[in-house]
Amino acid sequence: MDLTVFFLLIWPPYVANGSAVFASRLKWRHPVDFGRNFIDGRRIFGDGKTYEGVAIGIATGTVLGYFPNLVYHVIGVFDAFVLSASAVLGDLIGAFIKRRLCMPRGHPAFPLDQLDFLLTAFLVYSLFREIPVVYVLAAVVITPVIHRATNYVAYLLKLKKEPW
C-alpha cells in the first residue's frame, strides 16, 4: 500500500467533512431541508445541515484536498471535487438516517457518524476510479480514531457542542 496515495485519497473527504462545522459560526444559516419534515413527521436532516455547511465543505475539501497534489500528482481537481461533494452527501445521508431513528441532533451514532462521509465518498469515487480494497479497509480502521480526535479538538475550540 502506497501511504502517500492513501492519505491523498482520504484527505479531501476528511477536509470536506471537518470544515462544514465552520458554517455553525455564521450568523445566518439556511437548513438544507428548509425546516421541513419527512413523511414520518420528523425533520429530513435537521438544523445542523445547512447550505452554508454544504458549500464550505465542498469548497474547502476540493481546494485543500487538491493542494497537496500540486506536489504529489496523485489526484486531480475533479477527483478532489468528487471525493469532497460525495463526502458531504454521505454526511447528509447519515443525518437522514439518524432522524429516522429518532436520534436528536448531536447524538452520537457509532459507526454511522464516523464512516458515512468516507464510505459514500469512496463509493461514488469508485464509479470513476478504482480504489484498492486495502485502502478502504485501512480507512475504515483509522477513521473512527481520527474522527474522534478531531471532533474533540473542535469541541475544545468551541466549534462543536459535543466532543464526539
UniProtKB/Swiss-Prot annotation:
Pathway(s) where this gene product acts:
Membrane lipid metabolism; glycerophospholipid metabolism
The catalytic activity, as recorded, is: 2,3-bis-O-(geranylgeranyl)-sn-glycerol 1-phosphate + CTP + H(+) = CDP-2,3-bis-O-(geranylgeranyl)-sn-glycerol + diphosphate
Transmembrane residues, as ranges?
Answer: 3-23, 55-75, 77-97, 122-142
Task: List cofactor names only.
Answer: Mg(2+)
Instruction: Summarize the protein's role.
Output: Catalyzes the formation of CDP-2,3-bis-(O-geranylgeranyl)-sn-glycerol (CDP-archaeol) from 2,3-bis-(O-geranylgeranyl)-sn-glycerol 1-phosphate (DGGGP) and CTP. This reaction is the third ether-bond-formation step in the biosynthesis of archaeal membrane lipids.
Disulfides per UniProt: none
**GO molecular-function terms, A-Z:** CDP-2,3-bis-(O-geranylgeranyl)-sn-glycerol synthase activity
Q: How does it sit in the membrane?
A: Multi-pass membrane protein
Cellular component terms (Gene Ontology): plasma membrane
Q: Report keywords, A-Z.
A: Cell membrane, Lipid biosynthesis, Lipid metabolism, Magnesium, Membrane, Phospholipid biosynthesis, Phospholipid metabolism, Transferase, Transmembrane, Transmembrane helix
What is the name attached to this protein's record?
CDP-archaeol synthase
Identify its protein family: Belongs to the CDP-archaeol synthase family.
Q: Where in the cell is it found?
A: Cell membrane
The biological processes this protein is annotated with in GO are: glycerophospholipid biosynthetic process
